[in-house]
């Protein structure tokens, strides 16, 4: 399976978030990549901050890769899990640009763990992962049917 892992371009203009505005490595996506590649999947990992790509450019790169599944983070890094940005505008913007060209979609991060239904509605993803995402993402990639994958939520 082809899987795209995306850390959107986080910006804080007009944001009510007062946390650290410096870019951080998306460790959870790196761990996902390692597990997915071990299982034989083809993985594209993109980080808007490190690669200086806006969300439209990220979406174009994902679409060119033509993945079967796209995973997007709802917080800039695990460092933000305890105090995540309250809004979902950044991942929502990326998904809007992706416009259905990324296969099935999954969101990982604190929002899906704390408020899965609103996260699903606001992002329009197929599934949110609740809790630690690495092994769950690997399991999603290995299954055709997602309804029985534990630690996920769907509408």
PLM region descriptions:
Residues 2-3, 42:
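Residues that mark the start of a beta-strand
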Residues 3, 23-31:
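Short low-complexity stretches enriched in small and charged residues
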Residues 3-21:
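Short glycine-rich His-centered loop
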